[in-house]
Amino acid sequence: MRRLGIAFAVLAAIWPALSFAQNQPSKGSDLLIKLEADFAKAVAEHGRAAFVTYFAEDGVELEDGGGVTTREEMKKQVAWAEGTSLTWTPVRADMAASGDLGFTYGNYVFKSKNKEGQIVITYGKYVSVWKKQSDGSWKVVVDMGNSSPEPK
């Protein structure tokens, strides 16, 4: 009985630490959040051309309500028109125990101009799947998003 009491006392003492540790981001998720933030910054500064550079050779973009665009097809697309911008913020990331695959998701804002020159703002959510490459770098293998109402 005494051993059982000691076991419960030890468990009660370490339980808060175990719960706290489970709620902390892992180094893997921290890395993916940083990669995603670097990706977003590059696109904010350099547009569509920067977007493509973060994709693996076999990476694809699953378009909102549309088809699948390969990296090669992305490279052929024209640069964004003046006044077009894409910004996003990762909300969560997680990495596989193997340490070579992970995902991020978050919210995006896409701004463009219509034919009349008026600014059109599209809000949405995205998911990026990241894969560690043979050279040790990380690249996006799948990127997808869907539009959603303006956040409140």
What do these predicted ranges mean?
Residues 1-4:
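Positively charged n-region of N-terminal signal peptides that target proteins for export
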Residues 7-17:
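Bacterial N-terminal signal peptides
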Residues 22-53, 58-152:
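A beta-strand edge to alpha-helix "cap/lid" segment located at domain peripheries
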